[in-house]
């Protein structure tokens, strides 16, 4: 059985992510134990809250270097994806620097912030996360900050401006939306992470 570990960042709604995997029949463990994280087959980096609070908690739990050195697949969700970039404008804090790019506040285009609700996602590169999911499917977003499209974007969305809905580099994958709140498409994405992303 695949060992799936949810990294306890100390500021995330971990239970909803765990329940999403439970519904799919996968066993997961929530932990910040370094040895368990290092030995996991697949890892989830969730996040709700602010980038500076999350980075502070990761530093306090001595997780930053551990995460940076992981070689197994890691899926960052929402703030977890933003933490994978180099820097976040939210609190002006250096982040994990796993994937190039910066997280900036969504520009004021007259739309309310945070973006909260369903939005269309366009796949721009082949990625196993989206295997079997129809192009321009809808996923559920809650965010005021985003990563501009770059060479590591595998999907984009638009909320006044285009932004990265998903990024990937080597073993690190990130999604700006909440798959655990995105119905069948989100469930399939989580299943794809477990079953289609190689490790």
Swiss-Prot record:
Compartment annotation: Cytoplasm
Native source organism of the sequence: Haemophilus influenzae (strain ATCC 51907 / DSM 11121 / KW20 / Rd)
Its job: IGPS catalyzes the conversion of PRFAR and glutamine to IGP, AICAR and glutamate. The HisH subunit catalyzes the hydrolysis of glutamine to glutamate and ammonia as part of the synthesis of IGP and AICAR. The resulting ammonia molecule is channeled to the active site of HisF.
Keywords, alphabetical: Amino-acid biosynthesis, Cytoplasm, Glutamine amidotransferase, Histidine biosynthesis, Hydrolase, Lyase
An annotated GO cellular component: cytoplasm
NCBIfam families referenced in this protein's UniProt entry, alphabetically: IMP_synth_hisH
Listed EC numbers: 4.3.2.10, 3.5.1.2
Active site: 78, 178, 180
Coiled-coil regions, chain positions: none
Keyword Repressor: no
Protein name in UniProt: Imidazole glycerol phosphate synthase subunit HisH
PANTHER family: IMIDAZOLE GLYCEROL PHOSPHATE SYNTHASE SUBUNIT HISH (PTHR42701:SF1)
SUPFAM superfamilies linked to this entry: Class I glutamine amidotransferase-like (SSF52317)
GO molecular function, one term: lyase activity
Annotated ranges, domain Glutamine amidotransferase type-1: 3-199
Self-association and partners: Heterodimer of HisH and HisF.
CDD domains: GATase1_IGP_Synthase (cd01748)
GO terms of biological process kind: L-histidine biosynthetic process
């Amino acid at each position: 059985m695949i060992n799936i570990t949810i990294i306890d960042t100390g500021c995330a709604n971990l239970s909803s992510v765990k329940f999403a995997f439970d519904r799919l029949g996968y066993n997961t463990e929530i932990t910040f134990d370094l040895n368990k994280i290092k030995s996991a087959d697949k890892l989830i980096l969730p996040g709700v809250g602010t980038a500076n609070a999350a980075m502070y908690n990761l530093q306090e739990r001595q997780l930053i270097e551990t995460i940076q050195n992981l070689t197994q697949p890691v899926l960052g969700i929402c703030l977890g994806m933003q933490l994978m970039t180099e820097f976040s404008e939210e609190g002006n804090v250096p982040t994990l620097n796993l994937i190039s790019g910066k997280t900036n506040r969504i520009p004021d285009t007259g739309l309310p912030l945070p973006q909260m609700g369903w939005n269309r996602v366009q796949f721009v590169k082949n990625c196993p996360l989206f295997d079997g999911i129809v192009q321009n499917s809808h996923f559920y977003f809650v965010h005021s900050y985003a990563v501009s499209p770059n060479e590591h974007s595998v999907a984009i969305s638009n909320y006044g401006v285009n932004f990265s809905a998903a990024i990937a580099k080597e073993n690190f994958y990130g999604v700006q939306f909440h798959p655990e709140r995105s119905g069948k498409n989100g469930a399939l994405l989580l299943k794809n992470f477990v079953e289609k992303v190689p490790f």
